[in-house]
């Protein structure tokens, strides 16, 4: 823990140096947990050149003092004036704040602390996962795999989307997950044409393709997997069978392409080019993927607009899809650990339709 904390502080100190800033104020639950390893629903971290201060209220104070590395000075939070006094004491003239977690109250608080502040994308600091984070993600993917194996056999004609979604939720917890990382998506038949369909009372029929997008949380870290399963042995729509094969091809190409030599946009293009060269060119309507970690969607993105190189040990999804209005849809989503040349396919053992 101590070594990882020092590595994380090195990331933050470089951010301070690059932005010519004196301190970073962290108010989000995710980044507070990322730095300290201590889960809490409130608190303020001030990372400055001398040390790290955590201001946390009475619900967590005693536990935090015991659990958190001594490099972090834990203080009982009673008033915002404590944070302001610290900033004045260490000479904070330029403050970095988390733009992606910015609330109205947070912004008003910032104005009182420091006249000059810079909004940063705080998720960027978590792009490169450390060994303990990778272990947690591997574990949460394994929990998800266990449920997916059962799910493929479980889905039967006559079941509703809602029933299947609730079953997934229950099974993820039984398998060791803390809770859903997001509400499961279950879409059968024509409902599959809506990428973020909300499960309904529509019943599955034999020959349907059923898209199931689900994940859970382990030690704070999320999984995000999609499988489109065939119910029965023969599809009732040959167009969707062709679409499945094309999505599968694009998905595998993206998994094989992901590495530190490519940008998120370039990996997106690998998948997108395969679908756009087919009869389904008009039906891939979202980005290829995104980062996964303490947030279900975080940096880096695998999209047409993400022109940064993927960094080693980033965890991303590869999730191309085809969505044909009034017909149905196919999506296959996997999680990948980015490496220099050959990335690690984390979800390789999660079953597919064929």
Swiss-Prot record:
Pfam families: Creatinase_N, Peptidase_M24. Mn(2+) 2 binds at residues 213, 224, 333. The keyword Hydrolase applies. Its EC number is 3.4.11.9. GO terms for biological process: proteolysis. Mn(2+) 1 binds at residues 224, 290, 319, 333. GO terms for molecular function: aminopeptidase activity; metal ion binding; metallopeptidase activity. Its cofactor is Mn(2+). It catalyses: Release of any N-terminal amino acid, including proline, that is linked to proline, even from a dipeptide or tripeptide. InterPro entries: Creatin/AminoP/Spt16_N, Creatinase/aminopeptidase-like, Creatinase_N, Pept_M24, Peptidase_M24B, Peptidase_M24B_aminopep-P_CS. SUPFAM superfamilies: Creatinase/aminopeptidase (SSF55920), Creatinase/prolidase N-terminal domain (SSF53092). It comes from the Bacteria. Gene3D superfamilies: Creatinase/methionine aminopeptidase superfamily, Creatinase/prolidase N-terminal domain. Keywords: Aminopeptidase, Hydrolase, Manganese, Metal-binding, Metalloprotease, Protease. Binds 2 manganese ions per subunit. Belongs to the peptidase M24B family. This is Putative Xaa-Pro aminopeptidase. It comes from Mycoplasma pneumoniae (strain ATCC 29342 / M129 / Subtype 1) (Mycoplasmoides pneumoniae). The gene is pepP.
């Amino acid at each position: 823990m101590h070594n990882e904390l020092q590595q994380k502080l090195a990331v933050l100190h470089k951010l301070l140096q690059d932005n010519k800033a004196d301190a970073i104020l962290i108010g989000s639950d995710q980044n507070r947990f990322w730095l300290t390893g201590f889960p809490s629903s409130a608190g303020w971290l001030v990372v400055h050149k001398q040390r790290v201060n955590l201001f946390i209220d009475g619900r967590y104070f005693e536990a935090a003092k015991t659990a958190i590395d001594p490099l972090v000075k834990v203080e009982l939070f009673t008033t915002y004036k404590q944070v302001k006094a610290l900033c004045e004491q260490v000479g904070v003239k330029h403050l970095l704040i988390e733009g992606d977690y910015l609330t109205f109250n947070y912004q008003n608080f910032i104005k009182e602390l420091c006249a000059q502040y810079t909004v940063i994308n705080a998720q960027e600091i978590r792009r490169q996962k450390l060994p303990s984070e990778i272990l947690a993600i591997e574990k949460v993917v394994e929990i998800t795999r266990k449920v997916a194996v059962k799910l493929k056999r479980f889905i039967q004609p006559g079941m509703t989307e809602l029933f299947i979604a609730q079953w997934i939720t229950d099974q993820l917890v039984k398998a060791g997950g803390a809770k859903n990382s997001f509400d499961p998506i279950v879409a059968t038949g024509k409902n599959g044409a809506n990428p973020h369909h909300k499960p309904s009372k529509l019943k599955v029929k034999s020959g349907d393709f059923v898209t199931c997008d689900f994940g859970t949380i382990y030690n704070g870290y999320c999984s995000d997997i999609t499988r489109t399963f065939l119910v029965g042995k023969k599809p009732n729509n040959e167009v969707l069978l062709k679409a499945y094969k094309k999505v599968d091809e694009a998905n595998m190409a993206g998994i094989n392409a992901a590495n530190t030599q490519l940008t998120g946009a370039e990996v997106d293009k690998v998948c997108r080019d395969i679908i756009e060269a087919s009869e389904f060119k008009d039906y891939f309507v979202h980005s290829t993927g995104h980062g996964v970690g303490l947030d279900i969607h975080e940096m880096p993105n695998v999209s047409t607009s993400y022109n940064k190189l993927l960094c080693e040990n980033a965890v991303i999804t590869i999730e191309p899809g085809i969505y044909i209005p009034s017909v149905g849809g196919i999506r296959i989503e996997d999680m990948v650990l980015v490496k220099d040349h050959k990335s690690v396919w984390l979800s390789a053992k999660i079953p597919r339709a064929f």
